[in-house]
């Protein structure tokens, strides 16, 4: 029992120690109230740079790179994709042909609108064939599996 409490305590301690905002990030909000707080917060995030759909290819090199330098595909165990070389070549007629960009929430749900369309927090490199097969279905549990990707 002591072992479990120690592990939980360490886990919580590490989690909370990393959950601190950048030093000075909220300084402009200190002492303000109501509308002034809203304005100060808006000003703090005003320098956000909206990514283009094309920018995501380069962003994936940082966000979804495996330790061996290959693309981290969330749908398939076919993991030989090379950044730049294997990105959406227009193929995708079979699993393992190439990878493309996947929205975690179907883009039709927000009418392909910006900034959601290129929000990197909701974008993943995925096997093109499996991504196209998924269509606009939400993530969730299914009663009967009709198609399953390699390892998925």
Region locations from a protein language model:
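A short, polar/charged loop/turn motif at coil->beta-strand junctions and beta-hairpin connectors
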Residues: 6, 68, 95-98
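N-terminal module-boundary/linker segments of secreted carbohydrate-active enzymes
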Residues: 17-80
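Short, His- and charge-rich active-site/binding loops that engage polyanionic ligands
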Residues: 73, 78-98
């Amino acid at each position: 029992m002591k072992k479990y409490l120690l592990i939980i305590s360490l886990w919580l301690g590490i989690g909370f120690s990393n959950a601190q905002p950048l030093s000075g990030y909220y300084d402009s909000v200190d002492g303000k109230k109501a509308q002034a707080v809203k304005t100060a917060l808006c000003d703090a995030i005003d320098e956000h740079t909206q990514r283009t759909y094309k920018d995501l290819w380069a962003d994936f090199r940082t966000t979804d790179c495996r330790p061996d330098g290959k693309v981290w595909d969330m749908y398939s165990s076919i993991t030989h994709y090379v950044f730049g070389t294997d990105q959406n070549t227009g193929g995708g007629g079979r699993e393992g042909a190439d990878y493309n960009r996947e929205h975690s929430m179907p883009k039709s749900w927000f009418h392909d609108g910006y900034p959601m369309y290129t929000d990197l927090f909701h974008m993943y490199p995925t096997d093109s064939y499996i991504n196209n097969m998924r269509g606009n279905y939400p993530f969730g549990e299914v009663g009967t599996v009709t198609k399953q990707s390699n390892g998925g």
